Amino acid sequence: MQPSGTYTPEQFEIMVHNLTDVVHGEGGTARGIGWNAPYKIAGKTGTAQVKGVGQGESYVESRTAEHLRDHALFIAFAPVDDPQIAVAVIVENGGHGGSVAAPIARKLMDQYLIGNAGPAVKVSVPTSGDAD
């Protein structure tokens, strides 16, 4: 990949390395999708808060109405050394990006890059009636 914008080549390489660690690093928030990938993925997980949590309060998903639960986000590109696909996945009220949105992105990238998305990916998405 070639750097663009106002970043130096060194800064660009650091960013790509860090994004790759999100998926392939030991403590990466999307490491669950990278362990058996036949190509390197660079990505970033995210969670978008829907309902504000007041000072002194804590967010408890099981006690939050489904329509007020956090959105799950994941953006990625692959293969890192020769990018051919970029994806952005948003799962409304899905929870965490690494466990919900990232597996969906991996399936999309597998299908595009190797023509086989493999077995279905299990994601835990909230169901109606989990909260009031």
What are these model-derived regions, one by one?
Residues 1-4, 10, 16-119:
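Active-site beta-strand/loop architecture of penicillin-binding DD-peptidases
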Residues 113-132:
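Gram-negative outer-membrane assembly/targeting C-terminal domains
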